């Protein structure tokens, strides 16, 4: 496989060839109408990973709720690799307030959780409005008080233990 890389002429692009936006230009760029809501996430590394993913996919913003760690923090920055400077985020003392804020902006709100009414991710109908996706605590998941406020729930169907 590595031989093909050289024989086929495949190579990684240089930073200059990637033509990446500056942090300022990135903040002003058009975003996907998606809000990620983190409901009492414990791990700073998980929070940093969400920032980095949101940066990669041009996600509109992240809402950090409850005891979810917030930037600036060394362990978040270690995983986020600069994304805390480019991705818009807000802190809400409780997730219910974050859900209300997303709905006020016209977003539908979906829990990423296994419930008796979950829709498999691949069966989710196309969005007609922005979507807010709630990810719950690593152990407890999305809390019942938050589930009751959601427009639905989606789950990834698979055999992997996550």
Feature names for model-found ranges:
Residues 1-159:
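Post-transcriptional modification and biogenesis factors for structured RNAs
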């Amino acid at each position: 496989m590595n031989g093909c890389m050289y024989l086929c002429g495949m190579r990684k692009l240089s930073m200059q060839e990637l033509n990446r936006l500056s942090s300022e230009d990135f903040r002003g760029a058009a975003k996907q109408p998606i809000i990620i809501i983190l409901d009492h996430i414990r791990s700073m590394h998980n929070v940093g990973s969400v920032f980095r993913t949101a940066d990669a996919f041009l996600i509109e913003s992240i809402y950090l709720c409850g005891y979810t760690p917030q930037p600036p923090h060394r362990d978040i920055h270690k995983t986020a690799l600069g994304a805390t400077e480019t991705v818009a985020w807000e802190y809400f003392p409780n997730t219910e307030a974050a859900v209300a804020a997303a709905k006020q902006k016209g977003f539908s709100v979906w829990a990423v959780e296994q419930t008796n009414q979950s829709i498999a991710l691949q069966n989710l109908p196309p969005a007609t409005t922005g979507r807010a996706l709630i990810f719950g605590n690593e152990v407890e998941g999305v809390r019942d008080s938050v589930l009751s406020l959601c427009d639905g729930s989606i789950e990834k169907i698979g055999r992997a233990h996550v």
